[in-house]
Amino acid sequence: MYSAPSTCTCLCLHFLLLCFQVQVLAAEENVDFRIHVENQTRARDDVSRKQLRLYQLYSRTSGKHIQVLGRRISARGEDGDKYAQLLVETDTFGSQVRIKGKETEFYLCMNRKGKLVGKPDGTSKECVFIEKVLENNYTALMSAKYSGWYVGFTKKGRPRKGPKTRENQQDVHFMKRYPKGQAELQKPFKYTTVTKRSRRIRPTHPG
């Protein structure tokens, strides 16, 4: 003989169903948030305040600095070389940057063939890079338009094509360095301690 399920059993089933629905909703929200962050990382932000910094990018492979020589790019610059001084503009909260040679005013860009070139106009997405800070404290620059393609150089300072680069290659590892004479101007703010002034006691004179 078939017996109807008890009230307790029904309540348990409803509770389990409710828990399952909550987990599904939470998973969807996590996925949506992750997608939102990825989209914001790749999308340019014209609302946020842009930051402009001046520094050099030292190539781990060539032992020299990136140079923007007009339309030609290399990594053969000595410390303090005028063509190695780069104006780096942070474009979004997702670490997107545009890099311009201070001397030539040409932008570092990567074309559709993966070749590094200099361009006088940096508004194209080919001139935007995603800055990645690696575990070894080096920095890698991935193209915002061509995902997986990185700025990289050979030991002789020649540019590597984007399709031949990977994040774990030393060819794409760089270190930020201030130009000669600029480090002193970039010192962090320091607090100074002020000692409390003691009250001066006037000597008493006998009457």
UniProtKB/Swiss-Prot annotation:
Compartmental location: Secreted
GO biological process, one term: neurogenesis
Chief location: secreted
Function as written in the Swiss-Prot or TrEMBL entry: Plays an important role in the regulation of cell proliferation, cell differentiation and cell migration. Required for normal ossification and bone development. Stimulates hepatic and intestinal proliferation.
Keywords annotated in UniProt: Disulfide bond, Glycoprotein, Growth factor, Secreted, Signal
List of glycosylated residues: N39, N137
GO MF terms held by the record: growth factor activity; type 1 fibroblast growth factor receptor binding; type 2 fibroblast growth factor receptor binding
CDD domains xref list: beta-trefoil_FGF18
Gene Ontology cellular-component terms listed: cytoplasm; extracellular space
Quaternary context: Interacts with FGFR3 and FGFR4.
Family recorded in the similarity comment: Belongs to the heparin-binding growth factors family.
UniProt protein name: Fibroblast growth factor 18
Keyword Nucleus appears in the UniProt entry: no
Disulfide bonds: C109-C127
Biological classification of the source: Eukaryota, Metazoa, Chordata, Craniata, Vertebrata
InterPro entries: Fibroblast_GF_fam, IL1/FGF
Segment forming the signal sequence: 1-27
Organism the protein comes from: Bos taurus (Bovine)
